[in-house]
Amino acid sequence: GLYSTAARGKVWSVLKKLKVAVLFGGASSEHEVSRMSATSVLNNLDTEKYDVLPVGITKDGRWYLYSGPVEDLCSGAWERHSGNVPAAICPGSGLVAFENGVCRSLPVDVVFPVLHGKNGEDGTIQGLLELAGLPYVGCGVLGSAVCMDKIIANRVMDATGIPRCEWDCMERWQRPELAAIARRAAEKLGWPIFVKPANAGSSVGISKARDM
C-alpha cells in the first residue's frame, strides 16, 4: 500500500476521532441479547479511531450514559453503576445528558444501535434518530419496520416476486379460529411446522410443532 503500518498510525493520530454512540439494552424481550451483542461491539471498536459513548436503555425505557466496565453489561450490573448519567435523544439537540440539573448536548458523529427486537429493530429508534438529525448504522425506518413484521415482509416478497419459503399466518383477531387455522397450515405446509411471533426477533418465541 501507499503507507506502512506505522505511517497509517501517524495519519490516524492527527485525524479527528469519530464519536460513536452505542445504544444497548432496550425496552424489549430481547434486552439481554442486546447486552451480549453490545459487549462484543464495545470490545472490538478501535479506540484509536473512535471515541465511544455507550448509552444503555433499561427494560422500562430509562436511558443512561454509561462509563463503567464493559464486562458489567452481560450481567445487567451496568444499571447499578454509580456513574450513570440520565440521557436522551432529542430532535434539535441530538444526544443530551442531564447532570446536576444541567442539560448538555453531547457531540456525536454516528449512532450504532445495537438493539434487538421491538423498539430497536422495528423503525422506532431509526425514526427518532432521523428526527434528531443523527446519522446511524443499519437499515432505515421503512426497511426496519417491514422486516420486523414477518407477515408484512412475506406479503411484500409475494407482491414483488421474491422467492421465499412456504408460510401461513394467524392474525390476532383470528384467535377464536386457532384450531381451524392450525389444520389449514398443516395441510398446506406439512409437518413439522416452525411457529413464531410475527413481530419479534428471530430467536424469540420460536418452537417446532410435529402435530396438533
Give residue ranges: language-model regions:
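ATP-binding N-terminal substructure of ATP-dependent carboxylate-amine bond-forming enzymes
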Residues: 2-142, 146-152, 156-159, 171-183
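Residue-level signal for beta-strand positions within conserved beta-sheet cores that form or flank
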Residues: 16, 48-50, 163, 191, ...
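Acidic/histidine-enriched active-site and ligand-binding environments that engage anionic O-linkages
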Residues: 182-194
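Glycine-rich phosphate-binding loop of ATP-grasp-fold ATP-dependent ligases
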Residues: 34, 165-169, 192-212
